[in-house]
Structure formats: structure tokens, C-alpha cells
Amino acid sequence: VDIAKLDKKQLRDYRRQMQIIFQDPFSSLNPRMTAGDIVGEPLMVHDIAHGERQKEMVAELFERVGLRSGQLTSLPHQFSGGQRQRIGIARALALNPKLIVGDEPVSALDVSIQAQVINLLMDLQNELGLSYLFIAHDLAVVEHISHRVAVMYLGRIVEMTDKTSLFDMPLHPYTEALLYAVPIPKSGARTRTRKIVEGDVPSPINPPSGCHFHTRCPYA
């Protein structure tokens, strides 16, 4: 579906099927709204629930993401970074979407909190049958949460396959270079010659013709 061609009503209906979890939990929440109002706003805007029913649904969403119903009236600055991201997740779940886009949803969090949020997302996926489009640069996170992986270079997908194939036997030289760039904290763990990408990254405004990677490709 080309959403750019949808009219306002069609786009409004389509938005219910797709939601997003933003990268920065500190700037993605309105500081003047309570946590309960933030999560409940989609329910009101799409005329799903109002009044007491809305409060009940928000409380259920809070519980589902590991927050307490007593925190509904708290403002964003009263939460930690991990808790704020849980609010963002609850907001994304409010409309019961089919697809959730995660725009680097854990990159701004401490490593210990990252694991908690990732595990929450995986539990929600299993429980609700969600599909995620998870954007990330941390390969450890990608390997942990994904089923299929698409590797992009200058805005173009250069390789897409299942997780196991990608990490065990990458086919594109850029994917190989990415995986070889990950340090292994063990002496003698890597016996093969390290693959290093040489040259400068071309301008994304005026990318090379054909395969965008050919100016740096060792096989070209």
C-alpha cells in the first residue's frame, strides 16, 4: 500500500494498524501530559474508548508493559529512561496494531535496561502475535530479537535473509565487513583474516549507479 496516495480517512484507518516506538524515550513523550493521558490519547483520537473505559484500558496496558496503575497520573520526568520507553510501548499497543516499527528503541538506554525492554518486546510478540520492523545498528540486539534481517547501505537493501544464515554465512561483502567489525573478547577466537571496508562513504544524495557499494567493494 502506498500510504502517500491515501486520503485522510483512509490514512486514519490505516494508522490504527501501524504504530511506532521512537528512539529517544526522553523527547518522544509530551512533558505536559500525564503518563495515563499519553497512553490513552490514541484511544480517544480513534474513538475507541472514553471516560472510565479508557482509564481501565490504559491501566491494563500499563500492567502489560510492567508499569503500575498507580503511575498513571505521573508526569514523564518522574520516570526512568526504561520506564519512559515502556510508556512508549504501551502507547504503541493501545490500538492493537498489526505492525510496530521500532526506530532503534533501545539504543538510548543502558545495556541492562536494553535487555529488559528487548525481552518485553519479544514476550509481547509471542503473546499478541505482533510483527516488528526493528531498526537497529547493534548486531547483538539484531541477532537476539530478529527472525529475518535486512542489511542496508546508503538507503538500499543489499542483503536480506533469515537470521541464522546472515550471521553464519553472510553473502554480501558489506555484511561480511559489518560482522567482522564486531570485537570478540576471546584470544584466538577469530582465525580468518579480518575484512576491512576501504574508501569513503559516497554521498547519499548522489549515490553510485548500480550497486551502491561497488566503489568500496573488494570484488568489484
What are these regions (language model features)?
Residues 2, 53-70, 176-180:
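Conserved ABC ATPase "signature" region
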Residues 89, 113, 117:
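Hydrophobic anchor residue at the start of the ABC signature
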Residues 2-19, 45, 165-170, 202-208:
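ABC ATPase NBD coupling module
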Residues 69, 162-220:
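Charged, flexible cofactor/metal-binding loops and thiol motifs
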Residues 75-79, 83:
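Conserved ABC ATPase signature
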Residues 94-98:
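A short, proline-enriched helix->beta-strand linker immediately N-terminal to the Walker B motif
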